[in-house]
Amino acid sequence: MELEQLKKSVEENPDDSSLQFELGLYLWDNGGDSEKAAEHFVLSAKSDPNNAVAFKYLGHYYSRVTLDLNRAAKCYQRAVLINPNDSDSGEALCDLFDRQGKEILEIAVCRDASEKSPKAFWAFCRLGYIQLHQKKWSEAVQSLQHAIRGYPTMSDLWEALGLAYQRLGMFTAAIKAYGRAIELDETKIFALVESANIFLMLGSYRKGVELFEQALKISPQNISVLYGLASGLLSWSKECINLGAFGWAASLLEDARKAAKASSELASSMSCIWKLHGDIQLTYARCFPWSGGTENSEFTLKTFSDSILSWRSICYSAALSAKASYQRALHLAPWQANVYTDIAITCDLVSSLSDDSDTSSSWKLPEKMVLGALLLECENSEFWVALGCMSDNSALKLHALIRALHLDVSLAVAWAFMGQIFRESDEMKFAKQAFDCARSIDPTLALPWAGSADTYARESTSDEAFESCLRAAQISPLAEFQVGLAWLALLQGNISSPQIFACIEQAVQRSPYYPEPHNLHGLVCEARHNYHTAIASYRLALAAMSIYPESSVKSHAGKVSINLVRSLSKAGRFKESVMECANLKSKGLLDAGGLQIYAFSLWRTGQNDSALSVIRDLAGRISTREKTSIAFPISFICSLLYCISGLDSAITSIQKMPKDFFQSSKISFIVSAIHSLDQSDRLQSIVASTRSYITSQEEIVAMHYLIALSKLLKTGAGDFLGYEKGIAHLSKAIHMYPHSNLIRNLLGYILLAGEGMKDACTASRCCIINVSECANKEGLKSALEVLGGGSVACNVIGNTAPRFSFPTCHCQYLNAPVVVVELQRFLHQEPSNSSVRYLLILNLVQKAREQRFPRQLCRAIERLISVALSDETCSKEGEYKKFQLLLCASEISLQMGNIAESINHARKASSLSLPSSYLFLGHLQLCRAYAANGSTKNMQEEYRACLELKTDSNIGWICLKLIESQYNLEPDANLLEMSLQECSSQKKNSWKEWMAVYSLARGLDSTGKKDFFSAEEFLAQACSLLNSESCLLLCHGAVCMELARQSNDSQFLSLAVKSLSKVQASSLFPLPIVYTLLAQAHGSLGSKEKWEKNLRLEWFCWPPEMRPAEVYFQMHILARQSEDRPETTSGIENYQSPEKWVIRAIHTDPSCRRYWKVLDKLVQHPMS
């Protein structure tokens, strides 16, 4: 029907171009007569010569039906001329020209269309492809960028643009273009491969390998992908080798080997694939790590030997495989000279791993292979260097390197090997010059740095030697460089550093058959206090000596054995240490140092008589030693005699020693330490004579440290230390040496442990935090630990801007750092430091208490406590820390409402093996938890347990008294009073303070019971003991105000005014609420002026973010008073009207009806 209608319309209007075209299009699309359709297209074009679509379909007719390509081209050209945006006509025309080889016409059509219309995106696209084919990269980029605006989702365009960028060297832009192409079409192999190659070239090996693996999933049999993947994994493994990650490198090389093997099966005639496979196998043989190390618990000589043989076998088979692959590559491409040198290097490695020496010929196989390379490229300087390295003939070696320098005088590697030859010949001057030349040419070459390190070491410039060797080891992690670096670090006393530990770990992996790396690894682990690993390393060193062929190395077995017994002793394995020492003594290998370890181990195993016998043997050897080396043995003898025989025996032995023995600062310290324990001062004269040998400032400071400890011990009474004398001595010493952190930290620590409540604030002023010095020696307290402990004792220390409380302690005015921040910073640097984590937890608990235990902070504390409790320690100090952590966990759980968990933590704390004085606090926490749970029976049991255990903690008794009063437990007031007075009397300097706190607690308890007369008596008693404490005076003033309200007695108002006035006089900064109470008191006494003054002062006591609603309401009262007196306009209350003050009070506390009523009155009856 539609065809009939179209024909009828054409018959009626034969000159209508659109009707002719529609009829022709219908016939074309519906399989009608194409010739008839073409006739109608011709008629349409004649009627409307600008109908581009008609010319397009005529072009289709001539190109597809009649195959008249010339007519088709003319029709398409006409269509494009009329409408340059017609992509179908343009593409069809370009395809015709392309098939005919008319590339110039194709370019002309595209240029003409692109110039006529910027939306002719097909033309830009086609032009970009042609320019890419013609390698006109810059022009192609412009055309493709324009085409992408029209076809932003066409992946081929992005891929072509990426190629153009890549050829221009714009690699970042190329990666982005390829990436967009891959996003649009994940199967774009070319984009994946080329972007991966770019990543490899830029050193991003991981990303390159990931892209190759993605391409491999799409095309598993693609040779380019397999080759690229293998080369990427090889490059990535070399990066890992340079970082010392040999195990990771070996696993990467195993994957690379599989990829290279697969590509060789697909294209076995390509020499580059076999060369790549050889490179992979050679690198694998060089980097495969030995894994039978210190973690092997079942160590025997056989297992060690088997592990070495297994490791050698793996490396040897990889080297043989590399040799075979290189030979196959050489067979396929015998003109490749560099393959000869690869075979030479591989043969040399095979020879070193097999221990076979070819003596049948004067020329070794590696030398012959290098000569083969030189026959092909005799002017290649690198081949001459290779010949110099492979040859054992010194003359030929020197000749080859000189020849290489003749060809290229700036060849750094030739200068480096030349320097090595001179060093081996002991020509150190020439060696130094050669190494300097190599370094100046190429600073990234490792050998010149290592050679310079050897030169500096011979010249006794250890710092330069260490830095040079460190540089060499960083550039190339060879075992020889790393071992040398460890020796230099040992000489400098820096062997425990992380750099040395990493280097020696890597050296052990690559040279397990050599004893020296194992011995150095043991020394490093020992310096890092990892004694069990050190023991295993020393035993591995001894095992390596037993299988090592050179006798010169075996002669050092005695030194390694001494290292072993020392580590056994430090690890607490004294029985094994005694056995090893006895074995060494029977062989005559036990020197003075070994005898000291032997005696110490015997004493620790309870064999005191044998230990004394060894000490006598050691003392007999002292007379034959030089005076400079007798200080340490004598100090050891004195210390061990004190431990075995006691103080009197040690003093007697010291008095019998010749005076020449005391001419050392080390002995002076030991004698002074023993003297500090002697109340009779029998060593006074000897101590005085030895002090003259303490000359350096460091030693003088340390002696002051020891003298202060001596005064603590000697001037104390009973079980209490003499804090006053120790503090006095340190106070003098700190004036002489104000920059000594040792004295500062000790003074702070003693003040912190003292009796005075304000000593914590003084202690915080002594310490200066230096994070680099926080990792102190064992037994010494760091400044961070002192400040951390001080901020636990007094929450204000380090909290320079309290936002949740109004502390009255003067510590708040110290410009101290925020302790929590410093603790977090140091814990971030050393996550394994349990002491810092412990202090951080305690400080965070204090912070949570100040902020009323916010849930987010409580959860963070719970996580920290969980980590800390998982770090089990067996020492008494560790038990006490665990006790504190469990109490903190219990408190946090209690505040978060998890009562059962709180009780569980408190029970665990109460079951620890600690003195009863500490366990008292655990049962006190159980009392609080059961009280919160409503379990009265259990609370009474824990209350009685506290009474039985007792404590020397004043605050413990006070808290128990509060619990007793609040929950009406069975009172035993006499026992509590007596215990508290006894506890306070032992602390002479602070008994008044504690009794005042106790009176405060009783006063608060009476206030809670509405017994204000008793409360006033208790608080007055507290104020008489501490008449300058703001908290006590404030409480007393508030209670007096309540009594005055109840009894209408002006005497209580006077007492309130007196106490509250003292509060502000004793506070450096005004406290809130005090002025309000004073205003009430003065108002009741009839002083309106003082009433107004104090209300105004109350406004300034509050920080803006903490002002309560009542303060705004007070301002409304003053504002109304000011309206009655226009002359008073200078007050803060006049800044706003009374209505606005009330509105601000309502905004702060909208639940107060009183404010709403006042506002209603003000609105209804505004004042004039």
UniProtKB/Swiss-Prot annotation:
The keyword Signal does not apply. Disulfide bonds: none annotated. It comes from the Eukaryota. InterPro entries: Ski3/TTC37, TPR-like_helical_dom_sf, TPR_2, TPR_rpt. SMART domains: TPR. It is found in: Cytoplasm. TPR repeats lie at residues 17-51, 52-86, 121-154, 155-188, 190-222, 301-336, 412-445, 447-479, 515-548, 703-740, 920-953. GO terms for biological process: nuclear-transcribed mRNA catabolic process, 3'-5' exonucleolytic nonsense-mediated decay; positive regulation of wax biosynthetic process; post-transcriptional gene silencing. GO terms for cellular component: cytoplasm; Ski complex. One of its GO terms (molecular function) is DNA binding. Keywords: Cytoplasm, DNA-binding, Repeat, TPR repeat, Transcription, Transcription regulation. Component of the cytoplasmic SKI complex, which consists of SKI2, SKI3 and VIP3/SKI8. PANTHER family: SUPERKILLER 3 PROTEIN-RELATED (PTHR15704), SUPERKILLER COMPLEX PROTEIN 3 (PTHR15704:SF7). Component of the SKI complex which is thought to be involved in exosome-mediated RNA decay and associates with transcriptionally active genes in a manner dependent on PAF1 complex (PAF1C). This is Tetratricopeptide repeat protein SKI3. It comes from Arabidopsis thaliana. The gene is SKI3.
